[in-house]
């Protein structure tokens, strides 16, 4: 009970959410994950000349192959869930369904299945369960919530910019900068904090 009270000081879970609503939200997240997995592999296997010029210039195909967008989507799912357990469940199902869409497309449309990568990403999907549980507290109050949200934004900042000042400060990818800015808006603090 002491631990529960400690965590509820950071952020209290919503208790008045019906089971039907939770199921519908989780099913929607599963569908979104599956569609994004198929889209990511489709765009990965599509020649860049097929894509509109703006998507080619933004390097959208490689963007979905890097970590920043997936960290942001997991963070969004986590912080907008009703409780840390729902955050963990929803994020886990998002990644598992995304991997299902990705590797089903790989196997049945493109005709190959990279098992080593698949196993690695499944292990990461299982780890996302625990990370999302912790991430849910990023929208809470106090020093722990500030620390968690700072870690998330720091990881996304490192995806967007070279932070090694001996090599000079420069931007890696424009879309990662946008992703980082979205995370800053998503996890912004009250002025007093």
Please tell me what each predicted stretch does.
Residues 57-71, 116-127, 170-182:
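Alpha-helical transmembrane segments of polytopic membrane proteins
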Residues 46-58, 77-86, 104-115, 135-140, ...:
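Short juxtamembrane and helix-loop transition motifs at transmembrane-helix boundaries
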Residues 72-77, 128-132, 178-190:
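Hydrophobic core segments of alpha-helical transmembrane domains
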Residues 1-87, 91:
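N-terminal topogenic module of multi-pass integral membrane proteins
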Residues 147-193:
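Terminal transmembrane helical module of multi-pass membrane proteins
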Residues 20-32, 85-94, 119, 123, ...:
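Alpha-helical transmembrane segments of integral membrane proteins
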Residues 96-158:
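Membrane-proximal helix-loop-helix units in multi-pass membrane proteins
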């Amino acid at each position: 009970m002491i631990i529960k009270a400690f965590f509820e000081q950071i952020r209290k879970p919503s208790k008045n959410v019906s089971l039907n609503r939770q199921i519908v939200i989780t099913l929607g997240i599963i569908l979104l994950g599956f569609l994004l997995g198929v889209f990511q592999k489709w765009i990965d296997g599509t020649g860049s000349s097929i894509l509109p010029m703006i998507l080619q210039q933004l390097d959208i195909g490689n963007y979905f192959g890097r970590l920043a967008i997936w960290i942001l989507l997991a963070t969004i799912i986590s912080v907008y869930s009703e409780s840390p357990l729902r955050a963990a469940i929803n994020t886990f199902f998002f990644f598992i369904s995304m991997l299902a869409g990705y590797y089903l497309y790989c196997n049945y449309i493109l005709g190959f299945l990279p098992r080593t990568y698949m196993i690695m990403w499944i292990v990461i999907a299982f780890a996302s369960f625990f990370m999302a549980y912790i991430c849910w507290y990023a929208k809470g109050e106090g020093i722990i919530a500030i620390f968690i949200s700072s870690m998330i934004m720091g990881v996304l900042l490192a995806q967007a910019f070279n932070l090694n000042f001996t090599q000079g400060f420069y931007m890696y990818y424009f879309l990662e900068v946008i992703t980082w800015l979205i995370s800053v808006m998503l996890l912004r603090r009250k002025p007093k904090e």
